[in-house]
Amino acid sequence: MEKQRLKAQLSSLRVPLFSVPWPGQCSNKAEVIEARMMKWADEHNLLVTDEYRNRVIRTRYGLLAARCYPNAGEVLLQAIADYLVWFFLADDLFVDRVEVATDETIRNLTAMVDVLDLNVAGSPPVFGELAWLDVCQRLRRLLQAEAFERFAQGMRLWATTAALQILNHLRPTPVGIREYQTIRRHTSGLNPCTSLADAANKGSVQACEFYDADVQTLVRQTNNIVCWANDIQSLRIEIHQPGQFRNMVTIYAQQGQSLQDAVETTATRVNKEIAGFCELADAVTARPISDELHGLIDGLEYWIRGYLDWVVHDTMRYADQFIESDADDRRFSAPDLSLLKKNCSSVTESTSSLV
């Protein structure tokens, strides 16, 4: 009933555009990175059917990496692009575009945590686990130990707060906005992404600067801007998902607003976060800070602008013409046993990489 009421309002929905006061950038290696990313996804059997392959091609995850990390070295940028394609596929197939909870949900998510904790894959590995191990091993080699742990902690929180998201969707009514914001902050997967922003620019920030209260506020504002803007931009397709479909917009609508008013309320909050980010970033960079911290703040700006530009110029992930085919992944959620065996036998823990 909740979904049907929301779907009835989609045809007249107006989606706002967002702007930020700094220019976008993009790595000149974007197309090379995209092509290698597709090859890597093929080698790790992540593209379960031709239909799924075509979806990934038109989504352009490599372009997202190139826009959000324009100054990254080629090897690091490739690892990030491969991570992004893996993450979006895993998030869709394990959490978002399948039933709210399945027999495999806990096994899939705990396997992702075990790769981070143990640096090995299970036997047999779950779908995508060996690809995830490859990404993690490459990032371990490329990052300082503490910097990798920031990334790893973000991913652990993604996997564990997915359970809170599942509980929210098992309820007859959604949680409140405050609770949703907590869940969204971590299930988005953005914290692992922003944890790489310094290394992709001027090198890893020391812990004393990274965990400074103002710096963490900037990280959180970046997360809020991207996630809440995405709640608007992905609204049409998420309402058609079989499992996870509640977001900030739908919660405001559940509280009595029309869907259009809920979009506008969310957009106002995004713009307020952008203004707050700009003010605080100016204040922090006016202080005597390290080059690495300057690079991190630049990297947060790249992520905000890069994501917004990716949605407008590159990706068809949220395109209306693909909603019916892309919103429901239940037919892909349990790849047949022969494919899973192929995955396990053809890719080993010592998967080759660019490093």
From Swiss-Prot:
Decide whether keyword DNA repair is in the record. Answer: no
- Keywords recorded for this protein, A-Z: Lyase, Magnesium, Metal-binding
Cofactor annotation remark: Binds 3 Mg(2+) ions per subunit.
Positions annotated to bind Mg(2+) 3: 230, 234, 238
As recorded in UniProt, its EC number(s) are 4.2.3.163, 4.2.3.171
Please indicate which residues carry the site annotation Plays a critical role in the stabilization of intermediate cation. Answer: 88
Q: Which Pfam families match?
A: Terpene_syn_C_2
Which GO MF terms are attached to this record? metal ion binding; terpene synthase activity
> Motif DDXXXD motif: where?
91-96
Per the record, what are the reactions this protein catalyses?
A: (2E,6E)-farnesyl diphosphate + H2O = (+)-corvol ether B + diphosphate; (2E,6E)-farnesyl diphosphate + H2O = (+)-corvol ether A + diphosphate
Which PANTHER family would you find in this protein's record?
A: BETA-PINACENE SYNTHASE-RELATED, TERPENE SYNTHASE
What this chain does, per the record?
A: Terpene synthase that catalyzes the conversion of (2E,6E)-farnesyl diphosphate (FPP) into sesquiterpenes which are important for fungi-environment interactions. Produces a mixture consisting of 8 sesquiterpenes including corvol ethers A and B, as well as traces of epizonarene, gamma-cadinene, delta-cadinene, alpha-cadinene, alpha-cadinol, and an unidentified sesquiterpene. The major product is corvol ether A.
How are the domains described in the entry? The Asp-Asp-Xaa-Xaa-Xaa-Asp (DDXXXD) motif is important for the catalytic activity, presumably through binding to Mg(2+).
What protein am I looking at? Sesquiterpene synthase MAJ_08936
Natural source organism: Metarhizium majus (strain ARSEF 297)
